[in-house]
């Protein structure tokens, strides 16, 4: 046993220090980025935000809507091959280039992903998703996926420390997903005592990944557009959002009514709700590590997407970054004990 004395920080612990800017308008900021990935060799351009691969966020409908904003969607792994085929038959090439195919690490997951990718060559992204990216089985699966799909861009996770961020990259991942426990409906930290403050995880993993020519996606912990800006400022190449995109018409959650008001259910993918729906319940040897919440219906996701992108543009103007690519090198974080004046938050 040992204790690390270094303080680790989350998004709530910092603000971005404003700097001199020559920008005249938020409209001068370019949010689109262009990446060429280490192993796949694919070049992609767009806004590097990803809708999370949760079945109450990463839906086909969400992919259709967010493609119009140049945003990616990691479509959840619980759609059947037949449902994928129906979606591909109606989706445009532009939508498909904004889609990531999510998979677990079982043999059945692998075979299903093989079938999905065979449906259309425009599906260029694979998202390998496990809660604990510290297992040897996960790293071996990444290597297997790279061998099977040499031209696909592979995103894999989750990890939170620099040394383990390197492992999936060395095994064939182009992008590593960073985050254990920061999600709004994740209870891993309270059930297990395991986790890592998200901003520090992003900073440390970005340093490790970039040294190997890889990239990272900050997954979880964002509650507002300012957190998205902080994630990019900390070195994230992509930012994945779950709770911020939940509760919309395109989100796919079940709608319930209470006292004449309608709500949409949103739950973590390790919650009892998710396991009851997809695997027949919580196995006797494990505990649920997620919760279910009821969100007031939020309408079309387009309004939220505009708010996020607008906040991101504004953050760039405050530090003089004319392009999102410049935000990291123009970011100085200051530690704080308050984020906002909350006097009217309860009204």
Curated annotation (Swiss-Prot):
What do the Gene Ontology cellular component annotations say?
A: cytosol; GMP reductase complex
* Catalytic activity from the UniProt record: IMP + NH4(+) + NADP(+) = GMP + NADPH + 2 H(+)
Check the record and name the Pfam families matching this protein.
IMPDH
> Do you know which Gene3D superfamilies this protein is assigned to?
Aldolase class I
Q: Kindly give the InterPro entries that the UniProt entry links to this protein.
A: Aldolase_TIM, GMP_reductase, GMPR, IMP_DH/GMP_Rdtase_CS, IMP_DH_GMPRt
Asked if the record carries the keyword Transferase, the reply is no
Which CDD domains does the UniProt record give?
A: IMPDH (cd00381)
Family annotation (PROSITE patterns): IMP_DH_GMP_RED (PS00487)
- Residues noted as binding NADP(+) in the record, renumbered to the chain: 108-131, 216-239
GO biological process per UniProt? purine nucleotide metabolic process
The terms under GO molecular function for this entry are: GMP reductase activity; metal ion binding
Q: Where is the active site?
A: 186
Would you indicate the residue range of the signal peptide?
none
Family in the record: Belongs to the IMPDH/GMPR family. GuaC type 1 subfamily.
Q: How does it assemble?
A: Homotetramer.
Task: Report the function annotation for this chain.
Answer: Catalyzes the irreversible NADPH-dependent deamination of GMP to IMP. It functions in the conversion of nucleobase, nucleoside and nucleotide derivatives of G to A nucleotides, and in maintaining the intracellular balance of A and G nucleotides.
| Protein name (Swiss-Prot/TrEMBL) | GMP reductase
UniProt organism field: Salmonella choleraesuis (strain SC-B67)
């Amino acid at each position: 046993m040992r204790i690390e004395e270094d303080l680790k920080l989350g998004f709530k612990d910092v603000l971005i220090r404003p700097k001199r800017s020559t920008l005249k308008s938020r409209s001068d900021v370019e949010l689109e980025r262009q990446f060429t990935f280490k192993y796949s060799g694919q070049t992609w351009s767009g806004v590097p935000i990803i809708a999370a691969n949760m079945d109450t966020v990463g839906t086909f409908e969400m992919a259709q809507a967010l493609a119009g904003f140049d945003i990616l969607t990691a479509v959840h792994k619980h759609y059947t091959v037949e449902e994928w085929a129906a979606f591909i038959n109606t989706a445009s090439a532009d939508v498909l280039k904004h889609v990531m195919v999510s998979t677990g690490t079982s043999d059945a997951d692998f075979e299903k992903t093989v079938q999905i990718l065979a449906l259309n060559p425009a599906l260029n992204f694979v998202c390998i998703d496990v809660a604990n990216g510290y297992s040897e089985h996960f790293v071996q699966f990444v290597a297997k996926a790279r061998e099977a799909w040499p031209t696909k861009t592979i995103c894999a996770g989750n990890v939170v420390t620099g040394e383990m961020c390197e492992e999936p990259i060395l095994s064939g991942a182009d992008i590593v997903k960073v985050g254990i426990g920061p999600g709004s409906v994740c209870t891993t930290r309270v059930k297990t005592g395991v986790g890592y403050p998200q901003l520090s995880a992003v900073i440390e993993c970005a340093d490790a990944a970039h040294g190997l020519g890889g990239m990272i996606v900050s997954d979880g912990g964002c509650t507002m557009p300012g957190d998205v800006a902080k994630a990019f400022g900390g070195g994230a190449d992509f930012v994945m959002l779950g709770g911020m995109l939940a509760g919309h018409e395109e989100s796919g959650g079940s709608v319930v009514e209470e006292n004449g008001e309608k709500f949409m259910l949103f739950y973590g993918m390790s919650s009892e709700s998710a396991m009851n729906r997809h695997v027949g319940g919580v196995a006797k040897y494990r505990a649920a590590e997620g919760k279910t919440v009821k969100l007031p219906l939020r309408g079309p996701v387009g309004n939220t997407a505009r708010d996020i992108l607008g906040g991101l543009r504004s953050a760039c103007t405050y530090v003089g970054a004319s392009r999102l690519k410049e935000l990291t090198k123009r970011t100085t974080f200051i530690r704080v004990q308050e984020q906002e004046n909350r006097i009217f938050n309860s009204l």
